[in-house]
């Protein structure tokens, strides 16, 4: 299952659009974030999981979660991607209704 969310990263004072794609597939459980991310973004996997569970929502068990932050050439820094990552994961698990045509 695949779900997308859109956010922005600041490059200097310029906002740059970032697409957050969460892909869930059966297999060995894991959580990977790809797309030129710094350490704070890599640690988002722990914050996102804690937030989802704390909100009494279901965390996908027995699934491999891959989150892609695109464009890959743009460096993503900080914890500002936690919410869009959470929304993309929840969308991929169908816990959020899909939205069309934004």
Placement of each model-derived feature along the sequence:
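Peripheral, non-AAA+ core regions of ATP-driven protein-machinery
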Residues: 1-102
């Amino acid at each position: 299952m695949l779900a997308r969310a859109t956010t922005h990263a600041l490059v200097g004072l310029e906002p740059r659009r970032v697409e957050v794609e969460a892909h869930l597939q059966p297999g060995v459980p894991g959580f990977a974030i790809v797309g030129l991310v710094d350490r704070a973004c890599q640690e988002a996997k722990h914050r996102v999981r804690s937030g989802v569970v704390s909100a009494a929502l279901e965390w996908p068990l027995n699934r491999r979660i891959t989150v892609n932050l695109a464009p890959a050439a743009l460096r993503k820094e900080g914890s500002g991607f936690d919410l869009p990552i959470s929304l993309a994961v929840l969308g991929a698990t169908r816990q959020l209704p899909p939205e069309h045509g934004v």
